[in-house]
Swiss-Prot record:
It comes from Arabidopsis thaliana. This is Probable glutathione peroxidase 3, mitochondrial. GO terms for cellular component: cytosol; endoplasmic reticulum; endosome; Golgi apparatus; mitochondrion; trans-Golgi network. It is found in: Mitochondrion. The gene is GPX3. It catalyses: 2 glutathione + H2O2 = glutathione disulfide + 2 H2O. SUPFAM superfamilies: Thioredoxin-like. Its main location: mitochondrion.
Amino acid sequence: MPRSSRWVNQRATSKIKKFILFLGVAFVFYLYRYPSSPSTVEQSSTSIYNISVKDIEGKDVSLSKFTGKVLLIVNVASKCGLTHGNYKEMNILYAKYKTQGFEILAFPCNQFGSQEPGSNMEIKETVCNIFKAEFPIFDKIEVNGKNTCPLYNFLKEQKGGLFGDAIKWNFAKFLVDRQGNVVDRYAPTTSPLEIEKDIVKLLASA
């Protein structure tokens, strides 16, 4: 093999090794930042209807209130690049199916890029006045780490994600059937209207 070709091959091999090393370091960093917590999973509820959350005004809400309904549960943020598209499509779905037993439960979260920095009242004003949301908005929560709210411990236990259970970004979505089973989990980049067919299928189920 000519010396120049051998040099090119060695250089390409070196780049590949560096890239693989970079991926490995990035993956380890991700696991370190958002580790799974066995003790937290053990403490999670056996039913979504046994869990209580707080609404945007700080009042306790038992999720048993939503028994028999199809739920789309979303961690939301007001200043994300995904915000406008998601709220627009969630509004479409809610208007279309709310009378058929469909609910969207939106949980503000500031853990991703600090894109939900406001107080609960500021969030409520933004969501209701700018994004025109009519579905329930709840108290700002954490979805990863030691302060993860019980609901998200339960959701992640029921439906793990790619490369670990941690929520990866704003607007991750969980779909819950009428019996309270977490039937699917969707990436933040999955638009609400892409989920419509799955929602319709669950609404048609007894």
